[in-house]
């Protein structure tokens, strides 16, 4: 449907208004290039038309000029397309009426003509023979030129005295040639096997050295552990010795304290006996007075008897309370004594028996004192009883202090043993961590070496496959050459014989050269300081033999 001018102007204004609010059109390229062969060309007139649908374009510009002059130039049909943001003209594509035309260049046409020629087997063989003879002639000419150039160069070198710089350059060139020859020889299969054997021997040597180093480290760790165990044992024995010394001093102090208490008791008994004698004398002096005051004394004795009963009840209550506290303390001490060693328990048991015996003796003495106090009539009996009770309390205080110190020492010993146990666990954990790190390093190193060996084996395998393919192709070529050589003259057979002899000499020289290089590599391996057993193993695997002369 054709567009009106008004519609075009309105659409253009609308497009311009919208283009202000939207992104403007981006220019991708200032010009465009199109392959004109894609659109075809004008067909030639019926006078020059042939049966072939192929049209060869010799000169596009000349054809276009001719058609323009004759008024036969094809005019393209276009359509104007107006969109919101731009106006474009589109070319209507044309079609070939026959649908059989094909436009190609002259070069392509010549190539198709040349490829369309079908040669017979004899022509192919003749072409191959001609190409082969041409190659052989070229190679022979090149060989002759090389020989002539070498002879001229040798003559020139022999006749000319070299300068210092030229001598250095010649030595450098010879060194480069030797290096190139060495690198070329390194590509031989035997030397590759030799290098692989040497690398394997070095890997084994490194692995054995790592194993020895690991064993040495383990040995040092074991020695260090034994030394620490010995130090801990010495420390434990010294601690036990100090503990025994403290026990001995404590027992001596207890014995001295008990001896002092016994001496005080004996002294008090002597004083009481003296007082008893003195009282007897007073009794004798006061018999008259006692007779007179007998009634009063009986009342007073009854009162004192009641007081004594009360006092005995109070003493019994105090003794029961002391026994109960002592039983509780003994229970606590037994609970604490369970955490110490067995020999301490036995000592405490013996001391408990000794204390029980002393307690029994003390009770017997108290009974005796009570009996003597019952016979006495004065207040001094109560004082003696108070002295005995005070001595008993002092003994109990000393016992409690001793048990407290024992408990503190046992607690300190338990804390020391706990610290030693923690230190031991930390040492074991550190040793396990060090060993795990060393094992991980060894594993990583082994995996790296194994990965490198695998990569090298894969590369060698690929090279062997390539070489096998090359050998197969070479063998096929040799078989073809043998068949051709069988058809040649006897002179060619003689030349083949000479070539075989030369190849044999070269193979023998190559073998000798390889053997020399193997021996040189073995000497270099020995010079690196590798143990002799690995060198012998490399020599055995490489089959290094003495060089033999060529007859």
UniProtKB/Swiss-Prot annotation:
Domain of life of the organism encoding this protein: Eukaryota
Localization per Swiss-Prot or TrEMBL: Cytoplasm, Cytoskeleton, Cilium axoneme; Cytoplasm, Cytoskeleton, Flagellum axoneme; Cell projection, Cilium; Cell projection, Cilium, Flagellum
Start-end of Low complexity biased regions: 8-18
GO biological process: cerebrospinal fluid circulation; epithelial cilium movement involved in determination of left/right asymmetry; establishment of left/right asymmetry; flagellated sperm motility; regulation of cilium beat frequency involved in ciliary motility
Tissue expression profile of the protein: Expressed in respiratory cells and in sperm (at protein level).
Region (Disordered) location: 1-52, 232-256, 385-415
Main localisation: cytoplasm
Effect of inactivating the gene: Knockout animals display left-right asymmetry abnormalities, including situs inversus totalis. Nodal cilia rotational speed is reduced compared to heterozyous littermates. Mutant males also exhibit asthenospermia and are infertile.
Pfam families reported for this sequence: TPH (PF13868)
Keyword field: Cell projection, Cilium, Coiled coil, Cytoplasm, Cytoskeleton, Flagellum
InterPro entries membership: CFAP45 (IPR033253), TPH_dom (IPR043597)
Regions of compositional bias (Basic and acidic residues) in chain numbering: 387-415
Coiled coil: 276-524
GO MF: AMP binding
Listed GO CC annotations: 9+0 motile cilium; axonemal B tubule inner sheath; axonemal microtubule; extracellular region; sperm flagellum
Purpose: Microtubule inner protein (MIP) part of the dynein-decorated doublet microtubules (DMTs) in cilia axoneme, which is required for motile cilia beating. It is an AMP-binding protein that may facilitate dynein ATPase-dependent ciliary and flagellar beating via adenine nucleotide homeostasis. May function as a donor of AMP to AK8 and hence promote ADP production.
Family named by the database record: Belongs to the CFAP45 family.
Record's subunit section: Microtubule inner protein component of sperm flagellar doublet microtubules. Interacts with AK8; dimerization with AK8 may create a cavity at the interface of the dimer that can accommodate AMP. Interacts with CFAP52. Interacts with ENKUR. Directly interacts with DNALI1. Interacts with DNAH11. Interacts with DNAI1.
Name used for this protein in its record: Cilia- and flagella-associated protein 45
Organism (species): Mus musculus (Mouse)
């Amino acid at each position: 449907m054709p567009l009106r001018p008004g519609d075009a102007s309105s659409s253009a204004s609308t497009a311009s208004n919208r283009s202000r609010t939207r992104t403007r059109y981006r220019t991708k390229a200032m010009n465009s290039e199109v392959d004109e062969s894609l659109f075809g060309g004008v067909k030639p007139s019926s006078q020059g038309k042939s049966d072939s649908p192929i049209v060869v374009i010799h000169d596009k510009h000349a054809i276009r000029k001719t058609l323009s002059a004759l008024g036969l130039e094809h005019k393209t049909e276009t359509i104007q397309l107006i969109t919101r943001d731009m106006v474009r003209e589109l070319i209507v594509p044309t079609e070939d009426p026959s649908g059989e035309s094909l436009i190609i260049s002259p070069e392509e046409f010549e190539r198709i003509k040349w490829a369309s020629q079908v040669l017979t087997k004899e022509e192919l063989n003749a072409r191959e023979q001609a190409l082969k003879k041409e190659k052989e002639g070229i190679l022979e000419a090149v060989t002759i030129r090389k020989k002539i150039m070498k002879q001229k160069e040798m003559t020139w070198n022999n006749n000319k005295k070299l300068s210092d710089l030229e001598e250095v350059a010649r030595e450098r060139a010879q060194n480069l040639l030797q290096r190139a020859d060495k690198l070329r020889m390194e590509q031989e299969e035997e030397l590759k096997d030799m290098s692989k054997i040497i690398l394997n021997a070095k890997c084994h040597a490194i692995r054995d050295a790592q194993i020895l180093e690991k064993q040495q480290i383990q040995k040092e760790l074991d020695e260090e552990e034994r030394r620490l165990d010995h130090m801990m044992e010495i420390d434990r024995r010294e601690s036990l010795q100090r503990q025994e010394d403290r026990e001995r001093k404590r027992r001596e102090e207890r014995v001295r304290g008990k001896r002092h208490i016994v001496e005080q008791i004996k002294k008090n008994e002597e004083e009481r006996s003296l007082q008893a004698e003195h009282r007897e004398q007073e009794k004798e002096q006061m018999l008259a007075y006692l007779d007179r005051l007998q009634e009063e004394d009986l009342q007073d004795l009854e009162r004192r008897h009641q007081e004594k009963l009360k006092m005995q009840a109070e003493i019994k209550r105090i003794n029961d309370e002391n026994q109960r506290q002592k039983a509780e303390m003994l229970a606590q001490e037994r609970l604490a004594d369970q955490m110490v060693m067995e020999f301490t328990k036995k000592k405490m048991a013996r001391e408990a028996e000794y204390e029980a015996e002393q307690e029994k003796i003390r009770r017997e003495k108290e009974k005796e004192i009570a009996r003597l106090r019952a016979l006495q009539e004065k207040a001094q009996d109560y004082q003696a009883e108070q002295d005995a009770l005070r001595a008993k309390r002092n003994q109990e205080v000393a016992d409690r202090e001793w048990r407290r110190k024992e408990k503190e020492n046992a607690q300190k010993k338990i804390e020391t043993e706990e610290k030693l146990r923690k230190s031991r666990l930390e040492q074991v954990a550190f040793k396990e961590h060090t060993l795990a790190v060393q094992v991980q390093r060894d594993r990583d190193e082994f995996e790296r070496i194994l990965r490198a060996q695998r990569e090298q084996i894969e590369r060698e395998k690929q090279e062997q496959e390539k070489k096998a393919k090359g050998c197969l192709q070479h063998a096929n070529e040799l078989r073809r050459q043998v068949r051709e050589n069988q058809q040649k003259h006897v002179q060619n057979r003689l030349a083949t014989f000479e070539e075989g002899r030369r190849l044999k000499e070269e193979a023998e020289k190559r073998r000798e050269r390889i053997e020399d290089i193997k021996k040189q590599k073995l000497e270099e391996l020995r010079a690196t300081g590798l143990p002799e057993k690995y060198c012998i193993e490399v020599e055995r695997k490489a089959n290094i033999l003495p060089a033999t002369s060529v007859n």
